[in-house]
Amino acid sequence: MGKKRKRKKRSIAIDVKVIYQRGMQLYLEEENNFAGLKYLLRAAKAGYKKAYGEIGIILHREKNEADEAEEWFKKAEKTDSLFPSAAYEYGMLIYFKKGDIESSLNYLFQSAKQGCELAYGDIGTILYLEKNEINEALEWFKKAEEADCLFAPAAYYYGLLLVVEKGEWSQSLKYLQKAAREGYEMAYGELGSVLYLEKAEIDEAEKWFKKAEDAGCLHAPHAYDYGMLLIKERGDIERGNRYLDKAAEDGY
């Protein structure tokens, strides 16, 4: 009788693992978030700890259910099963939804130290924007680039850091172009300014100023530079003054 009970327990454990694996297959390979989540919740309710963090990731990333996702991340942490990519996702949730910089960085550092390369660029961005730790931010941006995971938002802030903090206009161009070409709209105006002021590439600069305006993100400094380009390079004083006025109205 004892042996039969043991075999039954092992069979249940195997079944739960199969349920978890099917959930991950549905989510990652078949891109069926709803069905994948359903299987993972079944596995989690049966006590399969590996599912906790995955549920948190799906709820946050795919369904934007931050509070429920946080409950699953906390559950994973309490059971010592918060794996690196879940720690990363939890850190980003805390940053964007809770505004808790220190707690966010704690989880991002935890994930990065365990090899989650996705965290590198975001750590650099937060250190730069929120803590003004320029040199440390620079190191994390470099780590992200070396790991081939410097994605558009981090590339933009890396380029911005190089312009604003280091005065390295030429070097910044590479990162601003990367961010802009990958569709990060915040980069458009900055790229236009660098191309105009540093490279004197008038046509290319104007193209990016126009893209920034079309995207509704032509901010005051770039509006000013666009206005000056129109006046000095195109002789279009009327249009140029409109952009200078916009920059002035926005406090530039």
Give short role names for the model-derived ranges:
Residues 14, 46-49, 79-83, 114-117, ...:
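Short helix-capping/linker turns of helical repeat alpha-solenoids
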Residues 14-42, 46, 57-60:
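Alpha-helical segment of the N-proximal tetratricopeptide repeat
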Residues 18, 51-52, 86, 119-120, ...:
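TPR alpha-solenoid repeat register
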Residues 24-25, 57-58, 92-93, 125-126, ...:
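Residue-level recognition of tetratricopeptide repeat
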